[in-house]
């Protein structure tokens, strides 16, 4: 086990944290590569693993690792959907500063609030579960993807084929999975 001495912590704090405001501190802690100008989806994983392990509102998930993974991916997707204005699956410091709802405030609230469902921005398990159930309902072949035929069933077949085709083609927000071009 690694040990952090007082001297190491003081050096780190004075160099990496003290000169910066809380949003830049968050950015500097979350990004995986200290030379990177961006936070990428995987950079959130260690923090979400700790949240899943220690948050009292998520204790019930300890016995279901498959739902822990789905919950974490959904939280990350919700963060990027609302914050990543370029749809690049990368968040700059500027994106973080402009985020509305505030990603930093949501993480602060997750640290303070015991009822995870009261954290409506990104972390609510109830919100995740509604999304998951809708996805499960549409993904009838259980391949983990929603194709055009699956999407046509949404809302009792409320979407036209032309609308669904435009969505599948990436009109509006691009349909990209992190790590792909």
Q: What is each stretch, according to the model?
A:
Residues 4-17, 38-65, 91-106, 115, ...:
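Amphipathic regulatory helices of Ca2+-sensor modules
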Residues 76, 89-96, 104-111, 115-152:
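Core solenoid repeat modules with strong leucine/isoleucine-rich periodicity
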Residues 1-13, 21-41, 62-90, 127-143, ...:
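Primarily EF-hand calcium-binding motifs
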């Amino acid at each position: 086990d690694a040990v952090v001495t007082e001297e190491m912590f003081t050096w780190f704090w004075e160099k990496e944290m003290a000169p910066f405001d809380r949003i830049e501190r968050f950015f500097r802690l979350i990004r995986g590569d200290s030379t990177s100008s961006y936070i990428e989806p995987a950079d959130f994983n260690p923090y979400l693993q700790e949240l899943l392990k220690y948050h009292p509102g998520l204790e019930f998930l300890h016995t279901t690792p498959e739902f822990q993974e789905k919950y974490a991916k959904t939280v990350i997707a919700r963060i990027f959907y609302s914050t990543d204005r370029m749809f690049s699956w990368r968040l700059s410091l500027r994106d973080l500063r402009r985020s509305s709802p505030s990603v930093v405030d949501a993480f602060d609230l997750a640290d303070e609030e015991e009822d995870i469902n009261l954290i409506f921005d990104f972390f609510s398990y109830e919100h995740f579960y509604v999304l998951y159930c809708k996805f499960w309902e549409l993904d009838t072949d259980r391949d983990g993807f929603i194709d055009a035929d699956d999407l046509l069933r949404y809302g009792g077949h409320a979407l036209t084929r032309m609308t669904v085709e435009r969505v599948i083609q990436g009109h509006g927000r691009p349909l990209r999975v992190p790590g792909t071009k």
